[in-house]
C-alpha cells in the first residue's frame, strides 16, 4: 500500500472515531483527547493535539493534568539522555509543544496565541493585558533566534515567571521574519549549526492590542517579573470600556505617558546609583542624577494654552544622558553588570532545561555535566544574562520610554515594532540580509557566496 493511501485511510479512521472523543453535550472530551495526543499513533495523535489546541488554555491544562505523573517524574529525573530516549516522554513533549505552540513547553506549560485578534478576544473576555512576543523565526521551532531560545530557558521555564504569565496575561507571539542560520561543516563528520543575528522583544498590550510598553531582549527573571507586575498595574489603570479609544481629557495626564515619565526617573536614578557603587567618577554620576527629569513635559500638558508654547521648548532644552553614558563607558558595561549578578538566579526549572540542552556529543563538551562542567556553563550564562539585562534596560528600554513619553509609541504595534527593529536592533525591514551582506566587501566567491531559494 502506498504511504499516501495509508495516511488517508488513517485520517479517515480518526474522523470516524472522533465522535467518541466528544462529550455528551457535543463539546470535546478533553481528558480523552489528552490521552490520544500522547498515546495515540500517527494521524490520531495529530488530530487530538489539534483539538486540544483549538480548546485553548483549557486544552493545555487537560493535557498537563492527564500526564501529571510523567511530568512530575521528569522533574526529578537525573539522567537527561535516558529521559530523552523514553518514547512516551518524547510524545508528551511534542504534544505540549503543539498545543501550546512553543518549543520546550514541558518546562513552561504555557498557551500562546499566534493570532492577535484571538488574543485580543481572550484578553477582553478575561480582563487581562496581552504579552506579545515578536521574534525572528517561530517560538515552536528549536532554531528560533537566540534570544527567544534564552527566553524559553531563563524566563518561561522559571516557576515565578510562568505562573505570572499564565495567571495575569494572555500570551501571543508573531514572527518578524525567518531567522538566519549558519552551518559549519568541519569535514570530518562534525557539524556546528547555530542561528546568527536577530533580536526579540516582549510588548505589553492592553486588551484592545494597543502598546503600553516593550521589554527589549533578555532580562533576568527577577527584573522581568518586576517590569511585568508594574505593567499589569498600568493596564488596569489605563483600561477603558471594550473598544473604547484611549482618550485623555483636557487637564488630565495620560497614565501611559506618566508611567513612562516616572520609569525614566527611576531608571536614571538607578543607573547613577549603580555607577557610584561600581567605582565610576562620582561627579559624572551625580551630574547625570541631577539632570532634569521629564515630569515637566507632562506637567505642561495640564494647561493647554501653556502646552503649545512650552512643550517645544522643554523638548529642545531637555538635557540628555551623556554623563551617565560617559561614566558607563569609562568603567565598562561588564563592571556595571557585575553589580546585578547576585540577582540573576536560575531556578530549578531553568537548570533542568539547561541540563537537557548541554551538548554531550563525542568531541564536543563530552561529560560536560561531570566535574563541575555544567556549573561553569551556568555561571558564564548568568554573567551574560546580567550584561544583557543592564544593556537592554539602560540603552534600549530607555529609548522606548522616551518614545512613549513623547507620544510616538503610538497605538500601532506594527509601526512601533518596525521602529524598534530599525533603530534599536539595527535590522530594518528594508534590509533582507540583516546587515550580513555589506555592499563593499569582496568575498572571492561566485556571486559573493549568495544563493537564493527555499531553505532545504
Short names for language-model regions:
Residues 10-21:
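Bacterial N-terminal signal peptides
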Residues 126-143, 171:
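Short active-site neighborhood of thiol/selenol oxidoreductases, capturing the structured segment around
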Residues 37, 115-129, 135:
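A short beta-strand-turn-helix
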Residues 27-111, 124-125, 225-456:
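Non-globular targeting/processing and membrane-anchoring segments
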Residues 1-7:
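N-terminal secretory signal peptides that target proteins for export/translocation
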Residues 62-66, 108, 134-135, 141-148, ...:
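Short, solvent-exposed loop/turn and secondary-structure capping segments
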Residues 113-124, 150-213, 226-231, 378-391, ...:
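Thioredoxin-like thiol-disulfide oxidoreductase module
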Amino acid at each position: 500500500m502506498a504511504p499516501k493511501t495509508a495516511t488517508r485511510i488513517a485520517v479517515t479512521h480518526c474522523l470516524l472515531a472522533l465522535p467518541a472523543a466528544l462529550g455528551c453535550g457535543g463539546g470535546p472530551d478533553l481528558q480523552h483527547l489528552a490521552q490520544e495526543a500522547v498515546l495515540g499513533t500517527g494521524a490520531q495523535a495529530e488530530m487530538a493535539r489539534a483539538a486540544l489546541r483549538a480548546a485553548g488554555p483549557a486544552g493545555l491544562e487537560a493535557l498537563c493534568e492527564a500526564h501529571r505523573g510523567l511530568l512530575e517524574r521528569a522533574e526529578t529525573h537525573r539522567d537527561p539522555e535516558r529521559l530523552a530516549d523514553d518514547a512516551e516522554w518524547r510524545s508528551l513533549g511534542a504534544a505540549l509543544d503543539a498545543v501550546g505552540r512553543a518549543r520546550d513547553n514541558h518546562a513552561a506549560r504555557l498557551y500562546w496565541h499566534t493570532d492577535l485578534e484571538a488574543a485580543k478576544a481572550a484578553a477582553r473576555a478575561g480582563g487581562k493585558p496581552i504579552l506579545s512576543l515578536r521574534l525572528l523565526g517561530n517560538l515552536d521551532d528549536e532554531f528560533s533566534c537566540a534570544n527567544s531560545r534564552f527566553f524559553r530557558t531563563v524566563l518561561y521555564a522559571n516557576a515565578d515567571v510562568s505562573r505570572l504569565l499564565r495567571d495575569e496575561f494572555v500570551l501571543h507571539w508573531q514572527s518578524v521574519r525567518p531567522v538566519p542560520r549558519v552551518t559549519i561543516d568541519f569535514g570530518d563528520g562534525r557539524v556546528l549549526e547555530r542561528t546568527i543575528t536577530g533580536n526579540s522583544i516582549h510588548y505589553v498590550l492592553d486588551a484592545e492590542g494597543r502598546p503600553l510598553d516593550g521589554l527589549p531582549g533578555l532580562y533576568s527573571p527577577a527584573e522581568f517579573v518586576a517590569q511585568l507586575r508594574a505593567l499589569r498595574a498600568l493596564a488596569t489603570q489605563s483600561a477603558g470600556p471594550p473598544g473604547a479609544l484611549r482618550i485623555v481629557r483636557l487637564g488630565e495626564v495620560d497614565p501611559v505617558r506618566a508611567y513612562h515619565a516616572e520609569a525614566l526617573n527611576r531608571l536614571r536614578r538607578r543607573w547613577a546609583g549603580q555607577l557610584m557603587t561600581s567605582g565610576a567618577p562620582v561627579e559624572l554620576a551625580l551630574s547625570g542624577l541631577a539632570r532634569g527629569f521629564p515630569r515637566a513635559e507632562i506637567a505642561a500638558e495640564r494647561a493647554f494654552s501653556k502646552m503649545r508654547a512650552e512643550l517645544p521648548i522643554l523638548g529642545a532644552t531637555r538635557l540628555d544622558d551623556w554623563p551617565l553614558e560617559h561614566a558607563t563607558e569609562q568603567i565598562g558595561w561588564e563592571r556595571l553588570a557585575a553589580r546585578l549578578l547576585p540577582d540573576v538566579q536560575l531556578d530549578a526549572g531553568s537548570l533542568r532545561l539547561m541540563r537537557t540542552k548541554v551538548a554531550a556529543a563525542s568531541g564536543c563538551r563530552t561529560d560536560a555535566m561531570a566535574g563541575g562542567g555544567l556549573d561553569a556553563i551556568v555561571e558564564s550564562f548568568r554573567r551574560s544574562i546580567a550584561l544583557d539585562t543592564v544593556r537592554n534596560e539602560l540603552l534600549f528600554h530607555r529609548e522606548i520610554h522616551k518614545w512613549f513619553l513623547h507620544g510616538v509609541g503610538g497605538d500601532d504595534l506594527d509601526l512601533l515594532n518596525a521602529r524598534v527593529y530599525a533603530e534599536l536592533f539595527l535590522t530594518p525591514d528594508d534590509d533582507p540580509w540583516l546587515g550580513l551582506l555589506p555592499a563593499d566587501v569582496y568575498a572571492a566567491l561566485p556571486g559573493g557566496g549568495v544563493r537564493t531559494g527555499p531553505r532545504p
